[in-house]
Structure formats: C-alpha cells, structure tokens
C-alpha cells in the first residue's frame, strides 16, 4: 500500500546527481539502431558495479542486444516491468551536456535519461527492501528506432 510516508521516503532517497551521471554515461555513447552494443555493455557494467545481477539474453537479433535485471522481494506477487530502449534516431551524434539545467545529447530524453531513472528506481527499491511482494524487472534493448 502506498502511504504518504512511503512516498516521501522514496522521494528523499532519489539521488539526482547519480541519475545524471548514469544518464550522461549512456548518452555519451553513440547508439543508432542496430548499433547499441557498446551502450548496452555500459549499462550492464553500471548495474553490475552497483551489485545487480545482470542477464544478457541471447536473441534472434544479435545486432539488438538486451540488458535485464530485477529486484525480487522473494515473496509471490506481481511483476512490474520497466522497459526502455538504448538506440537513438539516426541523426548526427551529440554528446551529453547540461544546458540551462537540462541534460541534452543523443537519446537524453528518448530514452537514455528514462533508463537512468529506471536504474535509480531499482537502487532505491533494493536499498529500501522494496517491494514487499513480487518483483520489479528492468529490460533495456536496441531496435526501437527502426526505419519501418
């Protein structure tokens, strides 16, 4: 049950600096569709270094790598999935920058910044021993910004 106290506890746990660092690490790696292997490797490295067990599932699309991790309560319950893509549109690459307090760069808002927010949410859930039932699954992959 979401109580006002729980919501405030989660808000207080958010480390904006860490989200920006994670997002910049992802944004600074060019990753046009079908070429997101390096950024997927970086995300897996970030998660592993932070103590998460990372899966790299084999797929029928080897040019579209995926990264999977989860926070599991150990108790039966539903699974909430955070899903995001790591590839970017085929425009000239732009490295990360902070402009007027906003993160810019290739994929900053679609969707590497969102993936960084997922990572922070997983950290908070794990460190707060949440959820109490079920699990939270995070998947990140290539092949979203396809030409079709």
Q: What are these regions, as identified by a protein language model?
A:
Residues 111-112, 116-148:
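Acidic/histidine-rich catalytic neighborhood of metal-dependent amide-processing enzymes
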Residues 2-108, 127-132:
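Acidic/His- and Gly-rich active-site-bordering loop/insert found
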